[in-house]
Amino acid sequence: MNYRGIYRRRYVFVLLLLVAVVNISYGWTVLKNKDYKRRYLSPSGVEKVRKHLSRKYVASRNNTQTFKKHYFSNTWAVHIDPPDNDVADRIAKKHGFTNIGKIGNIEGHYHFKHEEIGERELEKARHKTALLNLEDEVKFAEQQKILERVKRDGIPNDPYFKDMWYLLNTGQASGPAGVDMNVVPVWKKNITGRGIVISVLDDGLDWTHPDLEANYDQTASIVLNDNDNDPMPRDSDADNCHGTRCAGEAAAIANNGICGTGVAYNAKIGGVRMLDGQATDALEASALGFRGDHIDIYINCWGPKDDGKTFGKPGPMAAKALRLGAEQGRNRLGSIFVWATGNGGLTDDDCNCDGYTTSIFTISIGCIGDHGLSAYYTEKCSSTLAVTFNGASHKEGRENKMVTTDLYHQCTEEFKGTSASAPLAAGIIALTLEANPLLTWRDVQALIVHTAQITSPVDEGWKRNGAGFHFNHKFGFGRLDANAMVNAAQSWKNLPAQRKCTAASGFDHQDIPRGDSLFINIPTVACESSSAQIAKVEHVVLTVSFVHRRRGDVSIDLISPKDTKSQMLSPRKYDDSDEGLDEWSFMTVYNWGENPKGIWRLKITDNPNQDDVMNLFNGDNTDDVESLEERVIDTQTKQNKAEWEKMRKENPYFDVPYPNGVRKNKVTIEGSTQDHVKPKEGAKEPWGNYRNTNNINNNSSTAFKRKKKQ
């Protein structure tokens, strides 16, 4: 289990249309003691009032009182019955208050203010409250507590949030500012994943982590390896951190001063421990089918080996569990299975060789770095639906931070791989489901297709299909955009029922010429004039069998009637198997929205010269556009750094901040406008001449270009 030529046989082609609070405000009301109700207070009466105020007040169960410093303002709420503004003015003036006016539209409630009572004058304030309550017309008088309120600007206060550039990119990483998952606008709408349940199918979940515990859902958790209900990982093995890290990215708690923030920080999170032992078809089926009536989203960051030579797929029971989850999960709306595409780019692996990511029932998620470029370990295939960020670079080198929860109640910034991307997608889907809980599993996929954003736009791999959707074998339909998905979901109309149409190839055995291609036409009327008729396709599944002396030499392309080309299988230089394939199902989503009626063309190629083929597909020793982008970025970074170093050497004050008491203004010296600083009036000037200390920020052409780009 991995954490995230051709001769005679038959070819079968299948087209599938999937289609188709009560906020209880705690405060104090000073209770009146009718024994104190006198026009004037005698000395004994004053003493009684003081004794009354010195003990803890008896209040209704919705009211409590703690007199603490800095908790009370110099304003009072006073209820006068019968309502009379003149009476309110008279009582206010009598006791040194000003009647500010009525409180909103509440009948008989007035707002009094006392200018001479400070927030620390507790005894004086208590006495004034008692005096007001002794007035016959006053039903109650209450000094107003200063309430702690914060702006709901959607920005969490967790200590590591500033490093989470993929959630809010202010330019803190090496990439341009503003390029992120666009989740903050969703949080500002108070959509935070509330009511959605996510479960991580992995090596366990440290649910006692303080950044996860309050969101933990025991009902969404189990241990399949040991028949236990506690998904705590075996923390004696530090490698068993994978599930805990995935969980934190999706649903870590916000605004608790701990670690970072999950995308859906109010969603519930559970864990299915199933990777801490031997994997079997029965175990995987049990995990994928666990509590489909309760769990909305399943995070899966595992699969077959990413070694460039393995073909692996779900067993019959696991495959059935995926199908039943889509048909019956979430009260028949369909469970959402999010799957990491894999990290086999360095071994020229192809995610279409992974039967989990090619299932029509899963959402296959790839990764990009902060510049929108593919990671050096990205796998390309036609089943990838979309991408999210992780910390990787396009070529092996610098890495950016990915913040999440870790074992031993720690926080890590070192989470990597597509395992760091899929949980972000799960969190965004949780936000989407909160916005519209009636979305089906196919609706969620369709929303991704409709709202994903182009990343790395200069990459020549971007194409448009016959329905107008942009796609790329590296990036799917693009980068997930949380705000766009949520906005679309709120007015989304459910897709009609799913239809399936099968088109046979109509031939038996054919040979492929060595070093050449075999072309096969597959006509279809898309089940016209039947209940299975399809007008707009969603998924296309191609089932192929072949034998070949070297399986890795084979590539397969499928061209739709709208001339959209999907690479179903790319050559793999490490795949030396002579076993071929037996009824392997490849899948493409890149015909989404097209009318499938017409002639589909299948191209199967024998590629005997692997060096040339690898250069063609991977860009080695060729003009790889992404590599060019990376080189430009690195060059700009080096130039900028060199310019800063030069300024630092030439100016001894370059790194010195402006001291307290300094004011800065612009002056013209020899025709050039420069910063000039001097003490504020009355301040001493112990530091001497303090000019031109920050010119690089204001005048550097490199800095200006970067700022403009952002």
Swiss-Prot record:
Domain of life: Eukaryota
Swiss-Prot/TrEMBL keywords: Cleavage on pair of basic residues, Disulfide bond, Glycoprotein, Hydrolase, Protease, Serine protease, Signal, Zymogen
Ranges where the P/Homo B domain occurs: 495-638
Keyword match Repeat: no
Stored Gene3D superfamilies: Galactose-binding domain-like (2.60.120.260), Peptidase S8, pro-domain (3.30.70.850), Peptidase S8/S53 domain (3.40.50.200)
Active site per the UniProt annotation: 202, 242, 419
E.C. number(s) listed in UniProt: 3.4.21.-
A GO molecular-function descriptor: serine-type endopeptidase activity
Disulfide bonds: 259-411, 351-381, 501-527
Signal peptide: 1-29
Expression sites by tissue: Predominantly in the body column.
Role played: Probably involved in the processing of hormone and other protein precursors at sites comprised of pairs of basic amino acid residues.
Family: Belongs to the peptidase S8 family. Furin subfamily.
Alphabetized PANTHER family for the sequence: FURIN-LIKE PROTEASE 2, PROPROTEIN CONVERTASE SUBTILISIN/KEXIN-RELATED
Official protein name in the record: PC3-like endoprotease variant B
